[in-house]
């Protein structure tokens, strides 16, 4: 039986990959990697790019190309068999990574290269790749005594297992709660689109009625529109206690102990490497210089946003009392009455906009924006092997008709697919030893409603923004001009700069000039009418301060959790959250809420002591976009400058240098505050 993962491929043969292929393929790739490292080191000095970095990059690339589709399938097409195979590979990968990071001979080879004459002949990207490699050796404990190195390896392996366990618990808990509603009266107030989706969910399970789930496209409409307060409360409880010791499935997929162990091990790891705590370690590879700078940034932002947030909530309470006689707003009432107030103030609702954002309009509109700014054209290919019939595949070409990169687009929520939206790399750009250039490939994944009742998929404006956001990451990866592995595309980009291209792209979703072709009624093709557009723009900053305060709550919680960890006191997760809420939250939340238990970004993603990156990059993105506002949002020269200075440079230079080259100065906070309508 041939193993499709071990047969050379341009693009992953998704339909042929079975769980039993995973462990043998990864094991073989890891053995090849180890042999290669030993062979490269054994040849002795003088080490050059060609005899050291290039061969290692190529064999690493093979490993990445084998593991990337496996890891991706684990996220979008999870099954018990695949999950088990994936779990078996995690310790193998972690052990290999530690082995490389603590390989004395390899470390010495890199140091010889950096200290020798050859280093001066390398280009900027190659120098950066060598410098990063040396930094990563330090961060893998290369300088530690043997027993500490061994402990580092044990911690790293355990952390990768715990992150995976956390993620599985969240997925299982999300899928582990559903509610069948047979009486439509219980769903009064719900938009037709949500009812149709819930009905389709039930039919797929051969049930009569409406099936509600904790997936966002099912959960949000209930919280926002359903008149039935008891149902809102029931769903809110189920959602905000996922994977915890509370709620309807209390204790079943509980992440409490998992989080505590993760935080304790991260702290121990940081201290092994000589850092005071994990926040310091996290910043060793980021733009921000030290924890105090991050805390000052977040605290300053909170001071500016809080008074406005309090005002927004007071107005909502007054509105709910005056119009609906509600004396006390419960947490499950906030979204519901906010929507009512938004309609009252601006006579507009998300649902009114939905018919104007059918999938084909939104996707093609996105491509049109990219064409106007960067001269890049997207072309669909139908002959590519995908993991689900709904997945589409596109290639990007520039004005010289050169293929720059390609991507998979997987837009709809499904069972066994993890929630949220994300971009990931499938293949990175790299110049190979034989002179050929391997082009980048990306995965773009969202969780939107699928088409129902013969209508196309209709998106909310928020979903269109999400699509643009993820595509911004995609462009960063696919339009790279860097040909050095490790610093091309999104590789090697500091985490607090990685959200710049994505948040930057969101701006076009608010521009009348762009909305003229991003929108079009699914029946008539008519673009968003001016009257609706004006209302949408007027409502743009509705509750903007509350939104920022929520982001600050997440960012401060994450950062302080890591910066203030004390082994003798344990993690103090709920206590820390309560303290942060006192500082920044204005909306009350119940004591049984268990937000941290499903905060995958920091416990199972790359945002540990790094969630602040969203707000940090928001400052960069708003300021970068303000140049477009000055020079024209479809100004090709401005677009080219952003492409040349930021998007195409990958991780080859420091983000601040790249930003200054584009903007002509350091970033300023004003543009972001103005963007959210917050008085500085």
Swiss-Prot record:
Active-site residues (renumbered): 470
Cellular-component GO terms for this entry: cytoplasm; cytosol
Catalytic activity: Hydrolysis of oligopeptides, with broad specificity. Gly or Ala commonly occur as P1 or P1' residues, but more distant residues are also important, as is shown by the fact that Z-Gly-Pro-Gly-|-Gly-Pro-Ala is cleaved, but not Z-(Gly)(5)
Cofactor(s) listed: Zn(2+)
A single GO molecular function term of this UniProt record: metal ion binding
Entry note: cofactor: Binds 1 zinc ion.
UniProt superkingdom: Bacteria
Listed SUPFAM superfamilies: Metalloproteases ('zincins'), catalytic domain
Alphabetically ordered keywords of this record: Hydrolase, Metal-binding, Metalloprotease, Protease, Zinc
EC number: 3.4.24.70
Database matches in Pfam families: Peptidase_M3, TOP_N
GO annotation terms (biological process): DNA replication; peptide metabolic process; proteolysis; signal peptide processing
Residues binding Zn(2+): 469, 473, 476
Stated role: May play a specific role in the degradation of signal peptides after they are released from precursor forms of secreted proteins. Can cleave N-acetyl-L-Ala(4).
NCBIfam families: PRK10911.1
Family: Belongs to the peptidase M3 family.
Full protein name: Oligopeptidase A
UniProt source species: Escherichia coli (strain K12)
């Amino acid at each position: 039986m041939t193993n499709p993962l071990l047969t050379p491929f341009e693009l992953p043969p998704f339909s042929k990959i079975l769980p039993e292929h995973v462990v043998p393929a990864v094991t073989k790739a890891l053995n090849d990697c180890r042999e290669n490292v030993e062979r490269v080191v054994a040849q002795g000095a003088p080490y050059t790019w060609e005899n050291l970095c290039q061969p290692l990059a190529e064999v690493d690339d093979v490993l990445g190309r084998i593991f990337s589709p496996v890891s991706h399938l684990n996220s979008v097409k999870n099954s018990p068999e695949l999950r088990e195979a994936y779990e078996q590979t995690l310790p193998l990968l972690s052990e290999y990574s530690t082995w490389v990071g603590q390989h004395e001979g390899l470390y010495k080879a890199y140091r010889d290269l950096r200290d020798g004459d050859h280093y001066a002949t390398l280009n900027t990207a190659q120098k950066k790749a060598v410098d990063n490699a040396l930094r990563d050796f330090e961060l893998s404990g290369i300088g530690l005594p043997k027993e500490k190195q061994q402990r580092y390896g044990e911690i790293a392996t355990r952390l990768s297992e715990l992150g995976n366990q956390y993620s599985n618990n969240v997925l299982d808990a999300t899928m582990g709660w559903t509610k069948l509603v047979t009486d439509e009266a219980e769903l009064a107030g719900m938009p037709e689109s949500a009812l149709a989706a819930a009905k389709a969910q039930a039919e797929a399970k051969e049930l009569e009625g409406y099936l509600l789930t904790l997936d966002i496209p099912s959960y949000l409409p209930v919280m926002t529109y359903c008149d039935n307060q008891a149902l809102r409360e029931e769903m809110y409880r189920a959602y905000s206690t996922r994977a915890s010791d509370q709620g309807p499935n209390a204790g079943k997929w509980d992440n409490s102990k998992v989080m505590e162990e993760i935080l304790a091990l991260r702290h121990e790891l940081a201290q092994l490497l000589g850092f005071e705590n994990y926040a310091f370690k996290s910043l060793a590879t980021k733009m921000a210089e030290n924890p105090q700078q991050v805390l000052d940034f977040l605290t300053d932002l909170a001071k500016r946003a809080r008074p406005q947030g309090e005002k927004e909530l007071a107005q909502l309470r007054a509105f709910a009392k005056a119009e609906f006689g509600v004396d006390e707003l419960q947490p499950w009432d906030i979204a519901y009455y906010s929507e009512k107030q938004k309609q009252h103030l601006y006579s507009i609702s998300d649902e009114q906009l939905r018919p104007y954002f059918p999938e084909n309009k939104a996707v093609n509109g996105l491509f049109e924006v990219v064409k106007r700014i960067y001269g890049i054209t997207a072309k669909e290919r139908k002959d590519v092997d995908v993991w689900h019939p709904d997945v589409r595949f596109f290639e990007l070409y520039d004005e010289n008709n050169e293929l720059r990169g390609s991507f998979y687009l997987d837009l709809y929520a499904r069972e066994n697919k993890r929630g949220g939206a994300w971009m990931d790399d499938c293949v990175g750009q790299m110049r190979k030893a034989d002179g050929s250039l391997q082009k980048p490939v990306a995965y773009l994944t969202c969780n939107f409603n699928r088409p129902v009742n013969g209508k196309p998929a209709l998106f909310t404006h928020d979903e269109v923004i999400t699509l643009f956001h993820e595509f911004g990451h995609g462009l960063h990866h696919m339009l790279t001009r860097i040909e050095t592995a490790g610093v091309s595309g999104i590789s090697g980009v500091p985490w607090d700069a990685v959200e710049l291209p994505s948040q930057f792209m969101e701006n076009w979703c608010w521009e009348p000039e762009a909305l003229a072709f991003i929108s079009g009624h699914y029946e008539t093709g008519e673009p968003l009418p001016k009257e609706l557009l004006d209302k949408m723009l007027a409502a743009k900053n509705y509750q903007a301060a509350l939104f920022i305060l929520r982001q600050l709550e997440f960012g401060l919680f994450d950062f302080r959790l890591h910066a203030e960890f004390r082994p003798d006191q344990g993690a103090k997760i709920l206590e820390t959250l309560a303290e942060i809420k006192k500082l920044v939250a204005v909306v009350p939340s119940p004591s049984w809420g268990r937000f941290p238990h499903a905060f995958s970004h920091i416990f199972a993603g790359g945002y540990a002591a790094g969630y602040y990156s969203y707000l940090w990059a928001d400052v960069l993105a708003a300021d970068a976009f303000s140049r477009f506002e000055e020079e024209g949002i479809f100004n090709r020269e401005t677009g080219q400058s952003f492409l040349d200075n930021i998007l195409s440079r990958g991780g080859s230079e420091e983000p601040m240098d790249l930003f200054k080259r584009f903007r002509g100065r350091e970033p300023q906070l004003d543009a972001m505050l103005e963007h959210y309508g917050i008085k500085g």
